[in-house]
Amino acid sequence: MAPVSLPPGFRFHPTDEELIIYYLKRKINGRQIELEIIPEVDLYKCEPWDLPEKSFLPSKDLEWYFFSPRDRKYPNGSRTNRATKAGYWKATGKDRKVNSQRRAVGMKKTLVYYRGRAPHGSRTDWVMHEYRLDERECETDTGLQDAYALCRVFKKTAPGPKIIEHYGVVHHHVEQPQWMTSSIDRSPTLDVSCDGRGDDFESSSFSFPTETPMDSMHGGFGMQMSAPHEDGKWMQFLSEDAFNATNPFLTNPVSANFSCLPSKVDVALECARLQHRLTLPPLEVEDFPQDVSLDTKIGILRSNPNEVDILQEFLSVATASQELINGSTSSYPEMWLGASTSSASYVNELSSLVEMGGVGTSNHHESARLQVEIADMEVFKDEKKRVENLRGVKLVNNDLGEIVVEGDESNPTEDIIAQYPIKVTADNSGEAGHRMTDPTDVGGIDTAPIFSQSQPDDFAAGFDDVNPNASFDLYEKVDVNHRLFVSRVAAAKTFFHRIEPSKKVSFHSNPAATAVSKATEKFHFPVTTKVSGRVSIFSKFKALIRDKFLMMRPSHSYQRLGSKETTVNELLQIVSLLLAPKQINGCPTEQELVKKKAKEVMKPGWGREGSNKLWLPLSKGKGISSMFLSGKWTFLTSALAISTPAECDH
């Protein structure tokens, strides 16, 4: 399509909502656009400085609009490929929602062009706003897979178009409010980026108007108490559509989510719509933001500039006046001009306006500061015993009026201070007791004191009706308690133990070696050795017999070895007895020394039959004939007579 030239004075400055709802939605859904002024260009195959010549609307406004197909960076991914030959577009900030009639219709992304390759690219002044349609707004079955994105490209360092030059108006600082209010177009750089970084106005030469011209443009809005003849000036900028249209910012400021700041035209329309509502009767009170607050009774106080400031009146309607305690509360509700309206509605309106705090005073008429006395009270009625929470304001300045607001009587017992006097009574048993009495029993509710914040704390207020002459009946009573002390001794604990039979351990050794060792020990026993240590003849004889008999025995049979050993032992005993000397002249013989040693090592098993140990007579000083009493060797008793005594060496 060839470039379209617009007549002088016509410019293409659509809003974000119009770009998405009309142009982008019709493009994606295949519907016809009445005037095709946005071309279809693949922005990511072109450099930003080459885009102006591809636009259908060449103008002095350095911004251009294009439909760009969304090129996928990966075949199965959702990321868009935004790289060009000389650089790349980098997203800044986060996406913002674009709302239309309180619902999100699309998203807006801000991108900045960088020369080179990431992450070492250099930032430029080219900025692009990419608009995407929400999937719920797409009517085709394919969705947004093959959809387009509407892009607005501009260079933010370039000076924005001056509206004065386009219209041929001479620029004067004094006349700035006139052209601002009469102009309905918007500068291309006025669309503020809300990504938190200020990319659109970092180095822009566009200057925002100050607050004073904006107040003049709004016609004194901002709750200035101007004269009624200024209301007609608001109507010259409005059309019939301005009153019928709804704006999410006005109806619900909390839920409204703006993608950017409103333009001057939007602000003017909103101000005019609010001013129009001021002239209408208050049918409904809505929640308004702080900068567009309403008061349904501004017309009451606007006629007299010397009246009380409405903000101070709203803040003062919180508690009751001190004069209401005296009973003069009947004439105050009549002071409201709108007395037919319920008091609850006024309370709701006033409380909402006080919380918003957006009401200001006129620059021409400033009221003096007022001192307000605030107090709380509670009036108790005698007939129905109900309580009304009456709140009023008393102004120190006598020239000012007083405002009284009646509270809600739906909960009459909310702030009642319950008082129950205590009486001392005597019950049937004669013991003094206390019981709680109802306030009506002591003269009614009028006798109870009225508490307020200014009164000191009186802790005896609830005990006014206590009878000081309390009667007490005393009696004596003797109680005898018979008790039995029972003690319990713990039973002894029995620990059971188990006795196991002894285990028999058998040791098996070589019988031949055992017999030889025993025989050797017996033959080495010193029998005839003298005390002096000299070897006697008997020792030599014993050694000879041991060598002759023991070395010649066979060792292949255990039974034969035992019998021969017994025979040798008996023979040695006989020879020892024959050669044993008697005790002469009190000298201990060698035989006595042997018997002493035998006593030391003797055990109870010695001397029994079958024992292989040497047995010697234990009696001292007796003859050797006592050994033969058992009759074992009777045939040798005659040999004892020829035994000769041995010499005793000292």
Swiss-Prot record:
Enumerate the Gene Ontology biological process terms.
abscisic acid-activated signaling pathway; regulation of DNA-templated transcription
Q: Does the keyword Thylakoid apply?
A: no
Residue stretches making up the NAC domain = 6-156
Q: What is its main location?
A: nucleus
In which domain of life is the source organism classified? Eukaryota
| Expression sites (tissue/organ) | Expressed in leaves, roots and flowers.
Q: Name one GO molecular function term.
A: DNA binding
Give the domain section of the comments.
The NAC domain includes a DNA binding domain and a dimerization domain.
**Can you say what this protein is called?**
NAC domain-containing protein 54
Species of origin: Oryza sativa subsp. japonica
